[in-house]
From Swiss-Prot:
Transmembrane segments: none annotated. It is an enzyme of class 2 (transferase). Catalyzes the covalent attachment of ubiquitin to other proteins. Belongs to the ubiquitin-conjugating enzyme family. This is Ubiquitin-conjugating enzyme E2 U. CDD domains: UBCc_UBE2U. Gene3D superfamilies: Ubiquitin Conjugating Enzyme.
Length: 322
């Protein structure tokens, strides 16, 4: 059998659905109706217009002889909301002596909506929020938009959930001062010295650059010679017959690697003289390069092809037709 508090909350819930207050949504999240989730939208023509706030309300079995405990899920930057506990500063909620048994769930939610949209600047619990709101309202609006989301209501129904246990979950309040400090550190962080140091201003890099440049000037001829040797080797390999190339690749189990200049010289000692001629003059180099390809490609199978072509030319077409 349900107690007195449960029956009173059922009555309050029915009354809330009947009145359908604009910008207020509430639903119980426990079977005994002691735990509630609430969403309140700021009133029109106020700095809170278009913003929504999530709260939790915890009733006890002593309701309505004692007020419930109200807390914001995300603590707003508001003069009348404690930045540490997330509890709103409303006299009949803070002081049980000022609580009246005539107060209902609807009266509590309406009082919260009025407090959010019309903050009291006398004796605020959040001094920083009161100071900014008094001196610069535009800055205050900007701060509010940092952590409040627009109101997005899927429907206006306020029915009991089919499975209340799915709605039950731990809620963690976040102080705005903690959130604001974390946001300030992230959004205004400065680059580390490593990324701020320009590359050309790094003495180590400049020294290494001149060292590389000096080595290149000293061994410029050697580098060009090695480049020409490798170029000739690759060109000669590409001109090999496909059958020979495939047979050679099938024997090798490891991927093909470009040989060093020493290996190329050992393979073909005459390449040294040819490559040297290529490097000395560009025009003579191309000629030597071409002659090198022709000399290297004079394989036996090419001679057979030439003999076959010569033999075909000697045939008498008239005799063949007969």
């Amino acid at each position: 059998m349900h107690g007195r508090a449960y029956l009173l909350l059922q009555r309050d819930f029915y009354d809330l659905k009947e009145n359908n207050y604009k910008g207020i949504t509430a639903r119980p999240v426990s079977e005994d109706m002691m735990e509630w989730e609430v969403e309140i939208e700021g009133l029109q023509n106020s700095v809170w217009q278009g913003l929504v706030f999530q709260l939790t309300i915890h009733f006890t079995s002593e309701y309505n002889y004692a007020p419930p405990v109200v807390k914001f899920v995300t603590i707003p930057f508001h003069p009348n909301v404690d930045p540490h506990t997330g509890q709103p500063c409303i006299d009949f909620l803070d002081n049980p002596k000022k609580w009246n048994t005539n107060y209902t769930l609807s009266s509590i939610l309406l009082a919260l909506q009025v407090m959010l949209s019309n903050p009291v600047l006398e004796n605020p619990v959040n001094l920083e929020a009161a100071r900014i709101l008094t001196k610069d309202e535009s800055l205050y609006r900007t701060i509010l938009k940092l952590f409040n989301r627009p109101l997005q209501m899927k429907d206006d129904s306020q029915e009991l959930p089919k499975d209340p246990h799915k709605c039950i979950g731990p809620t963690k309040t976040t102080s705005f001062s903690d959130y604001y400090q974390a946001w300030s550190r992230i959004a205004t962080s400065k680059a580390t010295e490593y990324y701020r140091t320009a590359l050309l201003k790094d003495p180590n890099f400049i020294g290494q650059y001149y060292k590389w440049k000096k080595m290149d000037l000293q061994h410029h001829k050697e580098w060009n010679l090695k480049y020409s040797v490798i170029k000739c080797w690759l060109a000669r390999k590409n001109r090999m017959p496909d059958e020979v190339r495939h047979s050679m690749e099938g024997i090798k189990l490891c991927p093909t690697q470009i040989p060093t200049t020493d290996e190329i010289f050992l393979e073909s000692p005459t390449a040294i003289n040819s490559v040297t001629n290529i490097y000395e003059t560009e025009e003579e180099g191309w000629k030597s390069d071409t002659s090198l390809y022709e000399n290297n490609t004079d394989e036996p199978w090419e001679e057979e092809v030439e003999d076959l072509i010569s033999w075909i030319n000697t045939l008498n077409t008239n005799t063949l037709e007969d």
